[in-house]
Structure formats: C-alpha cells, structure tokens
Amino acid sequence: MRLKIGFILRSLLVVGSFLGLVVLWSSLSSRPDDQSPLSRMREDRDVNNPLPNRGGNGLAPGDDRFKPVVPWPHVEGVEVDLESIRRKNKAKNEQERHAGGDSQRDVMQRQYLTFKPQTFTYRDPVLRPGVLGNFEPKEPEPHGVVGGPGEKAKPLVLGPEYKQAVQASIKEFGFNMVASDMISLDRSVNDLRQEECKYWHYDENLLTSSVVIVFHNEGWSTLMRTVHSVIKRTPRKYLAEIVLIDDFSNKEHLKEKLDEYIKLWNGLVKVFRNERREGLIQARSIGAQKAKLGQVLIYLDAHCEVAVNWYAPLVAPISKDRTICTVPIIDVISGNTYEIIPQGGGDEDGYARGAWDWSMLWKRVPLTSREKRLRKTKTEPYRSPAMAGGLFAIEKDFFFELGLYDPGLQIWGGENFEISYKIWQCGGKLLFVPCSRVGHIYRLEGWQGNPPPLYVGSSPTLKNYVRVVEVWWDEYKDYFYASRPESKALPYGDISELKKFREDHNCKSFKWFMEEIAYDITAHYPLPPRNVEWGEIRGLETAYCIDSMGKTNGGFVELGPCHRMGGNQLFRINEANQLMQYDQCLTKGPDGSKVMITHCNLNEFKEWQYFKSLHRFTHITSGKCLDRSEVLHQVFISTCDSSKMTQKWEMNNIHSV
C-alpha cells in the first residue's frame, strides 16, 4: 500500500511538472495580442484579403507569427522527446514544400497588388428619407449679387450691341467672356440632383482633399468662378488646398494679377507655373506632385462650377476604399448664356456610363439594368468603364502607385481611357456619383484653340491613342487599327515600363475587362469588320479628293484639293460594304443623288462596293456609281458609264506622322 501511494505521488509530481512547464512555455510564446505593429498590420491585411487553402491550422508555410520562442521542454518520466519531433516535422515540411515548388500562398501572394492596404476606417453612408442630410445646407444658398445676372444659373442673354465683342471673346477663349464677366464669381446655382440625394447622411470622418486645376490662357472670370465655387461649397475642414497649375500661359491677367488675387485666401490657393507648355495630361501629373496637404486629389477643369453638397458624396467612397476613383455627374454650362442644364442622353434618370467606340472617340451609353441591380437606390454610385477625364477624385497615394499618367502621353487625348483601364484592370474601381454634380463649360465653335508646342510634333492625340491600346487592349487593339488604319505605322515611343507595370501588378486582361465591366460596349458599338481598302479617295489622275469638310450627321461631302494628311479626307470601306470615316457612313442624300455623311452603326448603310481594277465605287441599292463634278466640287451618284472619267477613283493609303 505504501508502494502504491509513493508511485501515485511520483506520477502526480511528473504530471504536475509537465503541466507547469507547458504553462510556462505558453506564457513565453508569441501571441496575437503581443504582436508588433508590423505583425498586426500583416494580420489585418490577411483578414481583409484571405487566402484559400492555408492548411488545417490556417497558417502558411513559413508563417512565424506563432513560432515558439523556447524549445519544447523535456519532462522527466515522459519518454517522448517533443522538441525533436517538432524539429523533425518542421524539416519534413520544409523539404516537401521545396520539393513541390512554391506553396499556394506564395503563388497567391504574387498575384496580389502591391498597393498599400486600407488603413482608414469609414462608415457607409445612410439614407434617411425625410431627414435632411448632415452635409446639406440648412438655409438656401445666398446669391452672389441679389437679383444679379446669372443667379441660380439662369441664362444671361446679351443684346446685339455686344455681338462683335462676344465673337472676339469666343475666338480667343472659346466662351462668351462678355457675359461671364457680368456674372458674379460667387453666383448661386440651381440644384439638379435627385430629391433623394438630400437625405443621405455621411460619416464626417471624410478624407481631406487637394483640388487641382490646370489652366492655359484661360479667361479670368471662368477660372476664378471655378475657384470661388469650390471654396463656397466645400466644408473648410476638408479642403486642404487648391493647387493651380499655370501651363505656360502668356495672358497678362494670369500673372501678377492672379498672384495678388489669391492672397485673399491666405495660402489656401496656390499657383505653380510650368517653365514650358506641358499640356493638360502632364500638367495634371505635376499638380499631383505639387499638392502636399490633401489625402485625395480632386481634378477639375478650369471652367467649372461645383454644385450644392458636391464634396461628401464624391469623397465618401474613396474614404471607404482607397482604390476607388469617383467621378461627379457632369452638367452642361452654356458657353454663351451660362445656364446650367443636365447632359442629354443616358437612361430615364439621365444616368450614363462612360464608353468609347473602336476609333477611341468618347461616348456615353445608358446605365444598364445589370448595374441598377447592384444598387439599392437610384442615387447610389454606379460602375462606369471609363471617365471623360476632366473631373474626378482619386486617393493621392493610390494615384502615385498607379504611376500617375503615362509620361509618354502628350498634351491632350486618351489619358481618360488610360487611367480608366489602369484602375479597372489593376484592381481598382471607377464609380460615377449621382449626388455629386459639377457644371462644365464646353468650348464654342469659333474658338481658335491652343495649338500644341513645336517640340510635340504632329498627331499627338492619335499617338496617345496608339500608346493606350498597345499597353492595355491586348488582342482588341486590332479593332482600333481597323477603325484608324492610318495609325498602324505611327511611332508611339517606348512602352516597356508600362508593360512591366502590368506584369508586376498582375493586371487583368482587356478581355476580362470587356466581359466583366465594359460588357455593354459592343451592344452599342459592335466590333468593326476588317477593312477592304482605306485611305484617300482621289479622282483618278486628278488632284482632288472626297472631303467631309468636318461635317457629320447629315452634311454633304465635297471635293477638295488632296492634302495627304488624312483627317477629313481619310475613308475606309469594310467587309460589311460600309464606306466610313470614323463613326460616320457615306450614303445617298434625300434627293437620291448627292452623297452625305451621317452617323451609323454596323447594321446601317451597307451599300458600297469598290472595284479596284475598274477604279469604281458602286452604290449597291441603286445600282449607280460614285461620280463627281470638279467644277461645282460636288460628289453624287449617277448612272454607271465606264467611259466617264469622273466615275473613276483610286484609294491611296495614308499614314499619320
């Protein structure tokens, strides 16, 4: 009996010692609660971006977050050496991992974007019908000048005595600056939002913003009204700064006068001047570098007016997810009267998605039922494949991680598509925001324009398009070249770094983008058929070519001296028997004779055949031939006559330079 009691006591001592050592080891081991900030950040990242098949314990091979800091103890009386087994199993696991190549976690980690994780906490907006939103003004917006011209965005119509001055201002600036100068810089505007927008409540923990405005030889009042509207309608706690980038202007009112004027805001508004004309695209990248204070970059054109409560709806999605880029609904400010109206088109609520045709012309298409189903209310943000490019908001660090704009893009054109594709294909989102509205003035006919500087060379916009499709469109680029055949041999510079960016960030294919995001583009703009011939259409053995003269949507084409520069004299005839220029088709006019040019899709105006050996264009539906009058410079169809030289044509390829 004494032996049994002794045995029991010794056994209890051994077991007690073992349990004590286990408790001691546990207290010395690394625990989740004791992680360093770096380890906690890594765990947060893994929670937000879970990886599949980590194994039974949920840990990846090589993950040392729960690695013991002391070896397993050897307990007297327990014959199993736990530490040796642990070392043996670890070596076996390491051997199996290396023998089998990279673990699934290693592979998956390489597929993750290298963008910073979300560190900002923000609650979703809440819709409370009937309860005025917390960012809504409590009182009606005050007028800039009570009873003044243009208040509440009502049209200002000038009399005939101003005609000459108005025309001169339109030629110089693109707008009726005579009327603009009569309107208060602080004028009140109309509210074009859906009524529901007034009842959204936003977490006040919004990110702050730097508003970046690029200008070149802008009119004074349109530029300053842009600045005034931002200051007037943006809560001061969120407006970190307004950064003006002067892209080498030579107007006197944009020099010392501007420097003195912005002192009114005690440093809130800053101006930086480029030492040469950089163009809108690169000037915006410069603006991102000059902006130091805001967490978000908001880009506005130099002739805008932000509307009531524009800020919170625009920045809230970015505050929730830093990889979201937002775009306000863009309203139209008349360049003549300064009335503000909604854009035409879109769905029954006026909402549209950004799109393009295959020649890369900007388009707007109605919001789809698929996108509507993703929202609970019609005033929530919705996905868009592309943006127009002039007005958008993006988290500053995210924009830098994307590489800003392609540094090879020059002056203007294509940058809106480049940033849109980059965002979507590399893991971000592009949202249009119905409750954030900004008015924008569009240039009027008669503006002399701002020609690019000499160092840029010819065809900068077309070169931009080529760079974009070569980097982002993959096999779809063939459809661009079918629509813009003159660009096929256009030199577009080095894109190796851009290709490397796509590879390093594991950006998705354009096919994925077309199927998942831009799925409705081909319904509106079907993939173009191959071209049979393309180039100038020259009268055989003459110096005259068919010229659209810039006319569209029903204008008559004419004969003009051949200039070999493409543009209005560049046509293509495709396998669908369409004779086209960009998104316009040639067809017979209402009189059944003269040839006009009008917008078409791929199911319309399939009515031409080109017989190269006969130098003849035949109008299929009428059986007549393409003819011309070199005296009247008219182009028409007439009864085919093989002896008539005016019915003989040749198509000569033209390459842009």
Curated annotation (Swiss-Prot):
SMART domains in UniProt? RICIN
Q: Which PROSITE patterns match?
A: RICIN_B_LECTIN
Keywords, alphabetical: Disulfide bond, Glycosyltransferase, Golgi apparatus, Lectin, Manganese, Membrane, Metal-binding, Signal-anchor, Transferase, Transmembrane, Transmembrane helix
Any single GO CC term annotated in Swiss-Prot or TrEMBL for this entry: Golgi membrane
How the protein sits in the membrane? Single-pass type II membrane protein
Q: What class of enzyme is it?
A: transferase
The protein's name is N-acetylgalactosaminyltransferase 7
What is the source species? Answer: Mus musculus
Q: Which gene encodes it?
A: Galnt7
